[in-house]
Amino acid sequence: MAPVSKTELEPPNGGWKAWRTVFGSFLLQTSSYGYVTACGVFTLYYKQVMLPEYSASQLGWIATIAVFLIFGVGIPIGALVDRYGTRPVVAPFVALGIVSLGLLSLCKTYWQIVLCQGVAFGLACSGTTLPAVICVTQWFSTKRGLAVGLASSGSSFGGLIFPIMVSRLINSHGFKTAIHWSTLVVGVCMIVGLICCEGPYPPKRLAAMKEKESSATPSLESPKIDEKPDESDLGVSSSIEASTHPKPAAKVLGMRHNLVPWIAFCVGVFCCTFSLLVPFDYLPIIAAEQGMKQDLAQYTLAMINAGSMIGRIIPGFVSDHLGQFNVMALVTTLSAIALLVVWLPVYYSPTNGGIIFFSLFYGFVSGGYTSLLSPCVVALVDGQVANLGLKFGIACLCLAFGALVGIPVSGAVADDTGNWGGLIGLSGAMMALGAVSFIVSRVKMGGWNPMSKV
C-alpha cells in the first residue's frame, strides 16, 4: 500500500463538495433527528385524543426508544462508515425511514406506534444521523465548528417546521393525512441529502490513513538492527516501551491519551442528554395544563427549536476561535440555569411570556451543546479523522443511555409526585452535573487558565 503523506492526513477544509455535504447533512438531520424532536406534538395528541389511558412516562417511551436507537447503535454504524463510506450505509436506512412513517399512519394501538415510530423510525435515523455528522467532520479542520453547527441546525429546523406542520394538519385533516404529508417531506429530504452527502476519502484511502495515524504514535527511537542492546538495559527498555504504548482501555476508546478528560466528557454527555429532551417532550403538555391555549402550547416546541437552530450555529462558530470545550462548558452551564432558574420558577408562577422566554432561551443554549459534541470528540482524539466513525460511536453510546433513561425517569417522577416540579428540578440537577463534568474535562486538557483555547 502506498504511503500517505502528512498533507493527505489533513482535511480539505472547504470546497464545493465539502459545502454540498454540509447541505446534505442538514437535510438528513432535518428529516431524521429533527422529526424525532417534534415528539412533544405527538405526545400531546396521544395523551389528549388517541391514547388518553396511558401515562406521561409511558408515552415518553416512544421518543425515548427512537433517540436511544439513533445513538445507541452508533458504534456499528460508525464502523460501517469507516469501512464502506457514507452513501452505501445511509441508503437502506433512508428506505426504512420512509416505510416506517408510512406504516405509522395505519397505527391504532400503543404498541403499534412504539414499533413504527419508536423502533423502526429510530433505527432508520441511526443510519442517517451519525454518518451525516461523520462525513462533515472529515471535510473540515479550522472551520469544523461552523460546518458542524450549520449541518446540525438541520435537526432544529426539522423540529421547527414539523410541529407546526403536523399539528395544523391533524387539526384540519386528521392524524393519517398529517403523517402522509410529513412522510413525503421526510422522504424528499432524505433522498436529496443522500445524494449530496459524500466523504472526502474513499474507503481504501481511509484505511491507508488509519494505518498512517496508528504508526504516528510517539515512541522512543528503536536501536539499529545490527546493534545488540546491553542485557542490563533490557528491563529498563521494556518498561519504557510499555509506558509509551497506549493502555488497553485507551486503545478500546480510540484514544492515544487524554483518557481522564475522555471519561469526564462521556459522563457529561450522559448527564446532559438525560435532561436535554425533557422540555421537548413535556413542555407542550405542561404549558397546556397551566392554562396556555392549546394552539400556542403546541408552538412552544417550535419556539425551542427556533432558538436551537440559532444556538447550533453561533456557538459552533465561536468555538472555532475560543475553543470547543470552553464554549461547551459555557452553554451547558447556561442550560442548567435555564432549567433551574427560569423554568422552575415559571412553573410555579406561570405566565405565557415566561414560558415563551424559557422556550427560546433554552433552545438557544441547549442547541450549542448538541452542535459541539462532535467537535469536542475530534479535539479529544487529536484531530484524527480515519477512525472518527468508531470514536463518535462510543460517544453516542453514552448519549443513547442518557436519552434512554432521561424522559421515562423524569415522567415517572412527575407521575409519582402528581406535579411537574420534581421533573423540572431533576432535569436541572442532571444538566448541572453534566456541566461540571465538561468543566473537569476542559481543565484536565488545558489547565486552569480560562484564556487558553481548549
Model-assigned labels for residue ranges:
Residues 95-108, 333-349:
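C-terminal ends and interior cores of transmembrane alpha-helices
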